[in-house]
């Protein structure tokens, strides 16, 4: 359903009982609400959560912001490398405000907040800006600053799909996902293809511009200094990370946990930048512990 949040129209989905424990899920860069693994959602619902998920601004059926344009990512990346300010059309703090607006629209004063990859960065911003609304914070496969990404993956991301057709987008997504998946738990190709096909078809049906991911990349680069602030976070914190993550190196998760008092860090051997079905039950057990379920 569509709601108004932070001055934008956002697409959200709420699952679980009205009296369930509210859990707001914040996805990664360019991710839609359907991109959360079905198995993870099922386990969380079985745990008694009321799950709120959404399409980020600039993604899926949420409001597109193509009128903001896209500054040169190579230029902005170089500026970030030498400590100059990054020209981002919007910030991760704006995206955290989107998430807060969703809770406000639903009449939820407090929630457990969980994010992965870029979503985990937004969760940190959320906890800093809205501690009174944050029952706990779970960061999965994310970083305290700009992620340390393997060079070949960065190069492919800069190249992007060869064109905007479904076939080109699927080929690109398959290649990226095969590069970042868990080496100890490789996702079957048929399951990966079906998952990505569903996501791309939904995005095309929503007539998303395809440039939202670029603006979100700039938001990540702009927020590189977050590591100097997160020591201020005083909410129960869980950090989950795989030690074979080529997209966001495990050092990012370790750094988050080292900077936040009382944070629990759980490292999964052989896990990359995805959600292996084999590890989801253990991940959910950790989430249950941090949320008190």
Label each residue range with its predicted role.
Residues 1-9:
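N-terminal cap/lid segment of alpha/beta-hydrolase-fold proteins
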Residues 8-82:
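Conserved HGGG/HGGXW glycine-rich cap/lid loop of the alpha/beta-hydrolase fold
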Residues 83-89, 93-111:
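Conserved acidic catalytic loop of the alpha/beta-hydrolase fold
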Residues 109-148:
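Conserved hydrolase catalytic core segment
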Residues 152-228, 235, 255:
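Alpha/beta-hydrolase
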Residues 233, 239-241:
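Short beta-strand/loop motif that positions the catalytic acidic residue
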Residues 244-248:
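Acidic catalytic loop of the alpha/beta-hydrolase fold
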Residues 263-293:
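Catalytic active-site module of serine/aspartate enzymes centered on a nucleophile-bearing elbow/loop
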